[in-house]
Amino acid sequence: MGFRKILAQDQKDNMSGHDSTQRQKTLEGATAGRFVAAITVAALLTLGQGCRTGEDDVHRWANTAQGPRKLVAVLTHDKYPMDLRIEAAETLVSMKPRGGRRIGIQGTDEQQGLVDALAQMPPAPRTALIAKLVPNLQAEMAKPAPVQVVGQPAKTDMSVPYKDAAFAILTHEDGALIPDEALRKSVRASLAQWCTTNFADRLEDSSQLYGVEQVLRELKAEGVRNLPDQILPNANKLDRLAELTAELGDAETKQRAGQKLVDVAKFVNSNAWVAQKRPGVEAANKASKLTPTEDQLKGQLAQYQDEELLRVFSSMKKIGGKAVVEFLLGFVQDKAAVEKRRVAAMAALQGNLDRNSAAQAQIALSLAGDPATPDPLRDLSLARVGEFPRAMVVEKLYELFKNDKWQVRWVAASLVLKMSDTSQVQEFMSKLSSADGLAITEPLSYGGLLADLKGSTPPAELAAKYSATGNSVPARLTALSYYYAAGTPADISKIESFLKDGTAAPKCKADAKDCEWKCTVQGAAGSETKEIKTVGEFVEFCVKPALDKRAKGLSK
């Protein structure tokens, strides 16, 4: 019994120990389970936090090989917050070029850039995204451009890629990415402002995907509306400002540009301009170790002023308009002005005069007929006369046939022929008949112009008519010169009858400059100059050799 009690107690103790062990195991198992579960949750939380894309990732990807691909994924996937998607877009824009290419905007053959990625998005979410992106691009475009310092490396204009992105989005598929008209108008205004701010530097910035000129041509009149504000004394790229305004500007913009150019021209032509530039010229002389006298320095400044004023006149020619024409017409009439400058001013009037203005025509005619007018200015004055209708100016041109200088008549008569047709040849010959002191250059050139006339009567028929005896000598010589300029070997027989014509040829006035009656012929001993005293000698030594030479050329 005692044994059984001891055995029973042992069993009870054993059972108690077993139960205790089991309870401990159960407790330990439960604790371990809770620990594992906690670790798992923590790991998941940590993993979730580690995979969440943030701005730091977006910025870091700008410098990694696969960065553009990841940025496009963030941009186009709606699971990301809008602000992060916008940040991804801006990062694509601001990425440094790779291999000389802005892959963030343009993409590559293997990877989309910003614009193509936007184009692939569904319209509604894309429109919402662009509505938030574009104002950010505009804000970056509006930031001040860096101030460039002469002699130092050029500073990077950080707004360039934002301008390029805005332009690319605006123009992609004819504006399909910006259906909102108000936003499109706003972008166009921002682009115009960007191009006309710091114009000269941005015009030359080769880092742009789309140059200033390309952008302005897309914007047309709207793009250049503010360009006249850049037309100032000492402005760089004045010629390009004028050219783009002339090409793209509306009437009001061109008018403002014209007035601004007049203001610049007046300043450049002033003593104030000379005083402003003098220190720079003196410094340049010093740097070159030159020591000009006062007169030499004045000569340098005058030449500098000539060059600058001629550049302004060149820009004026492109713009035209009332203000420009009035200024230039006044300038060409100023006898105190430097001849070179007057000539340049008259050249700048080409194509800008009012064809219906008799007053403007009269200014050009008066200059052409004034004995004091320098010959280069006279020639250009007559060229400007040629821009007016024949009926308005022809009688005034005929009056110039009486000018003491044969060169004036020559240019005026040539102009009349260029403005005429064959029905008006009789009128021309009649006026030429009273001309005094012709030079041989005149009929020889008139004959060539006669050959070019249009009309119902063939020039050859007119040549035969007016070369005959009974016409005035100037008319006959002009008609015979038709054969000199345009005759064929078949015409030799037509002129041979004049070889013995003893009618006296015209004589130069005693003081006529460069006037002569001579022709050079080829003889056995070489070339020989022949004095021309008669109509027959004119035919023999001037006209017939030209036809003979033409015949030899055809026989080869």
What are these regions (language model features)?
Residues 1-31:
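N-terminal secretory signal peptides that target proteins for export/translocation
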Residues 35-45:
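Hydrophobic helical h-region of N-terminal Sec-dependent signal peptides
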